[in-house]
């Protein structure tokens, strides 16, 4: 094979070849994007990225619907997650090799960027019972036949993206963080608060 030039039109390049074996390589680009709520999220080629967070995982003993074969888990962050970014970070891209097949147990690449700790931006506890169906019990008859019960939720969730003033007042030290493909995470922080560079 030989290299040839092409002029992409609207992001597409037409390649005409005779019958042959062909490998095509595309170089993914690391990009930051502004979310509708004013935060920043990142992509690398077709991959949406999320913060790599250590996990504290335990079986939820209060969940009545779990079985030994299909347990319910509580998964909480075991490493810092409260970071703000500028959207102008220079990435360090690390490609990971694996001989595993299937390859689901490893992260194919990691991207390291600089971020700032955002003090006082903490998880929020939401406690509620589902009451969404007409019978007022939160479940319908078919679900009862299958053994369902009212869902009592007691969740820790990521708070909304804070205001620019909150970010400015609570901006902490700079640290290196690691981004990985969204699908390689169980706990997901994808949209980061934005801080402005002076």
Model feature map: region roles:
Residues 2-4, 18, 144, 182:
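Secreted/extracellular small peptides and ectodomain modules produced from precursors
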Residues 26-198:
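C-terminal beta-rich recognition modules with glycine/proline-rich loops and embedded aromatic residues
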Residues 13-26:
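Short, well-structured beta-strand segments within conserved domains
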Residues 1-15, 32-37:
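Solvent-exposed beta-strand/loop surfaces of large extracellular or lumenal domains
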């Amino acid at each position: 094979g030989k290299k040839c030039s092409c002029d992409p039109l609207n992001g597409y390049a037409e390649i005409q070849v005779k019958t042959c074996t062909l490998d095509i390589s595309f170089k993914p680009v690391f990009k930051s994007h502004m979310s509708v709520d004013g935060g920043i999220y990142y992509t690398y080629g077709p991959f949406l990225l999320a913060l790599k967070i250590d996990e504290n995982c335990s079986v939820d003993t209060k969940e009545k619907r779990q079985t030994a074969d299909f347990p319910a888990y509580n998964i909480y962050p075991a490493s810092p997650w409260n970071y703000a970014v500028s959207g102008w970070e220079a990435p360090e891209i690390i490609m990971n090799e694996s001989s595993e097949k299937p390859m689901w147990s490893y992260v194919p690449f990691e991207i390291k960027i600089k971020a700032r700790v955002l003090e006082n931006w903490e998880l929020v506890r939401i406690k509620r019972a589902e009451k969404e169906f007409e019978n007022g019990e939160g479940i319908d008859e078919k679900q009862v036949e299958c053994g369902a019960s009212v869902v009592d939720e007691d969740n820790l969730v990521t708070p909304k993206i804070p205001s620019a003033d909150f970010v400015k007042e609570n901006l902490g030290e700079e640290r290196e963080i690691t981004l990985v493909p969204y699908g390689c995470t169980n706990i997901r922080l994808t949209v980061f608060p934005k801080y402005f560079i002076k």
